[in-house]
Curated annotation (Swiss-Prot):
Compartment(s) of residence: Secreted
Classification of source organism: Eukaryota, Metazoa, Chordata, Craniata, Vertebrata
Main location: secreted
UniProt cross-references to SUPFAM superfamilies, sorted A to Z: C-type lectin-like (SSF56436)
The organism of origin for this protein: Crotalus adamanteus (Eastern diamondback rattlesnake)
InterPro entries linked: C-type_lectin-like, C-type_lectin-like/link_sf, C-type_lectin/snaclec_domain, CTDL_fold
Residues spanning the signal sequence: 1-23
Gene Ontology cellular component terms for the protein in this record: extracellular region
Official protein name in the record: C-type lectin 9a
Family, as annotated: Belongs to the snaclec family.
Length: 157
């Protein structure tokens, strides 16, 4: 009986060590992992430029969040729900660089826009996720307004 328990326990340890979480990286304490990136919502309202600067100071490669899929949008929306401030918007890393442009050609992290989720009639200036759409749709808001935000960075493996 003792041998059976010992062997069973040994097999359980081997199974758990091999199964893992599917992630080959660890995010710092307080950060959440999704698809090879670390994310964290911040309650301290900042304007868009200051929020982007703050994110870049948190970790190498840190920026305001870029959103590249429906799955990532859902994940970020869940993080946004954790923000304590009752603000209508939270910043994301998308901003029009010139008044003549309809939309920015890239996110603040330099990645191309391959996924869009504009709220109806919105596609200009600084973008935020709006509480009215459960933080799933993107809306324009004044770049100087102070809003909570979500940072994202690729961890070093």
């Amino acid at each position: 009986m003792g041998r059976f328990i010992f062997v069973s326990f040994g097999l359980l340890v081997v199974f758990l060590s091999l199964s893992g979480t599917g992630a080959d990286f660890d995010c710092p304490s307080g950060w959440s992992a999704y698809d090879q990136y670390c994310y964290k919502p911040f309650n301290e309202p900042q304007n868009w430029d200051d929020a982007e600067r703050f994110c870049s100071e948190q970790a190498k490669g840190g920026h305001l969040v870029s959103i590249e899929s429906d799955g990532e949008a859902d994940f970020v929306a869940q993080l946004a729900q954790k923000i304590d401030k009752p603000d209508i918007y939270i910043w994301i890393g998308l901003r029009v660089q010139g008044k003549e442009q309809q939309c920015s050609s890239e996110w603040s992290d330099g990645s191309s826009i391959i996924y869009v989720n504009w709220n109806k009639g919105e596609s200009q200036m600084c973008q935020g996720l709006t509480r009215w759409t459960n933080f799933l749709k993107w809306d324009y808001t004044d770049c100087q307004a102070k809003k909570p935000f979500v940072c994202k960075f690729p961890p070093e493996c």
